[in-house]
Amino acid sequence: MAAKDVVFGDAARAKMVEGVNILANAVKVTLGPKGRNVVLERSFGGPTVTKDGVSVAKEIELKDKLQNMGAQMVKEVASKTSDNAGDGTTTATVLAQSIVREGMKFVAAGMNPMDLKRGIDKAVGAAVEELKKLSKPTTTSKEIAQVGAISANSDASIGERIAEAMDKVGKEGVITVEDGKSLADELEVVEGMQFDRGYLSPYFINNPEKQVVQLDSPFVLLFDKKVSNIRDLLPVLEQVAKAGRPLLIIAEDVEGEALATLVVNNIRGILKTAAVKAPGFGDRRKAMLEDIAILTGGTVIAEEIGLTLEKATLQDLGQAKRIEIGKENTIIIDGAGDASAIEGRVKQIRAQIEEATSDYDREKLQERVAKLAGGVAVIKVGAATEVEMKEKKARVEDALHATRAAVEEGIVPGGGVALLRARAAIAGLHGENPDQNAGIKIVLRAMEEPLRQIVLNAGEEASVVVAKVIEGKGNYGYNAASGEYGDLVEMGVLDPTKVTRTALQNAASVASLMLTTDCAVAESPKEESAPAMPGGMGGMGGMEGMM
């Protein structure tokens, strides 16, 4: 086992804070409508230009082990916020840096870190409740477009595309983002279905950049039991291999020898296959397999109806134009099923909804209707160059997550104003002792920080703008894009409540952990000794005699 360096107290915290500052300073330049770009080096190909906080954070790895620990903890804030809310990563990083910076001053002054943490938690709890009160539901397509535009760094066209896509497939519908072929963004609605099961083995992945399996015009084998013996599958696999097309297996489970053989065939390029578990459980699983069968024009191979795997033919398999399988989701696009059969199935499920007694059953049945009838909207991102395409695509994906979050939990005024207004709930808050009060003060100060950073990135004087916004009431704030003050909701500067809430909670959680850290253990740098000098060549003596 390698030797470790053990560092205690202020020395450990100071190094970790340095790491936090390096990462946060790199990320926070991207905040707001006038945020700057960050250029990321790639080991091959051109560099990537981005204004996405989490993309910047993910690239940062520091040489100093202790600094790197601090940076990685804040990176966790950004990626957790991105996973939960899909946006707000830069805001979360700015909040975390502020809480750590202010908190360290109090820790250095001898206050109890655990009480500071309790004060911080108390203040964040009150602020989150206040944010929920400030929140209002998104009702119009215009509001959805505004949320999308703000999240895409004030690009109104992206917001409009997303609002249009949500109109087409409904708020519960599936929307994906692809590379376009032209300079303009395009929207295409494709019949399709998504379910929450991912690939059974990462070895099926054939698009490493997106970490997904993409199958073009595949066959779909639907089986309601476990597959563990490859012999059962061989007849079907041989027929599919002859047809020269990929195969997706959807079964209760594919395990052991069967899964291993599929993986080996895939890696060797003999037969392009993928396997996923069937969605749902019990009777619902059977019903959902039947839905997929109708959508793809196949048959569920079940012993109840006298079908076995060994006797399955290509006629029993479903087909689709394209299937995309991620770690947690599978999307079937353009199934080859008969339109009238799909319509009949939807009517049948709607009749079941009418008769359903429990809310849970009703909700699950409605989900099935949406999957069969809703389709998938594809936003094709247009750009002049590949570098611009990647950057724009990342912004569209961010905006899509933000609009989903807005539909889910509502919206609050953007531009850092919601956090300023939520301070009202904390202003009168008191802890059980002075140290907890200091924790509350830390959060009060941190909640100004996103607005300060937006203003700084816009090249204005932060303290003047913050003071003026604090004087105002309600939605009154500063629109950094136009440099005007006014009602931000009317101006269309909106943030999803979920994004703001998640950013604050995650930032406080990780920052509190750092304040209460008193020891850091890291691997000692290896001392590499210089290589020995090579020996001289033999037989070189007696050169003088040759002169």
UniProtKB/Swiss-Prot annotation:
- What are the binding positions for ATP in this chain? 30-33, 51, 87-91, 415, 479-481, 495
Concerning InterPro entries, the annotation shows: Chaperonin_Cpn60_CS (IPR018370), Cpn60/GroEL (IPR001844), Cpn60/GroEL/TCP-1 (IPR002423), GroEL-like_apical_dom_sf (IPR027409), GROEL-like_equatorial_sf (IPR027413), TCP-1-like_intermed_sf (IPR027410)
Give the matching Pfam families. Answer: Cpn60_TCP1
Report whether Isomerase shows up as a keyword of the record.
yes
UniProt-listed GO biological process terms: protein refolding
Q: Which PROSITE patterns match?
A: CHAPERONINS_CPN60 (PS00296)
Could you list this entry's UniProt keywords, alphabetically sorted.
Answer: ATP-binding, Chaperone, Cytoplasm, Isomerase, Nucleotide-binding
A GO CC annotation given for this chain: cytoplasm
Specify the domain of life of the species encoding this protein: Bacteria
Q: Where in the cell is it found?
A: Cytoplasm
A molecular function (GO) term: unfolded protein binding
Q: What does this protein do?
A: Together with its co-chaperonin GroES, plays an essential role in assisting protein folding. The GroEL-GroES system forms a nano-cage that allows encapsulation of the non-native substrate proteins and provides a physical environment optimized to promote and accelerate protein folding.
What is the annotated quaternary arrangement, including any partners?
A: Forms a cylinder of 14 subunits composed of two heptameric rings stacked back-to-back. Interacts with the co-chaperonin GroES.
The identity of this protein, by name, is: Chaperonin GroEL
Gene symbol of the encoding locus? groEL
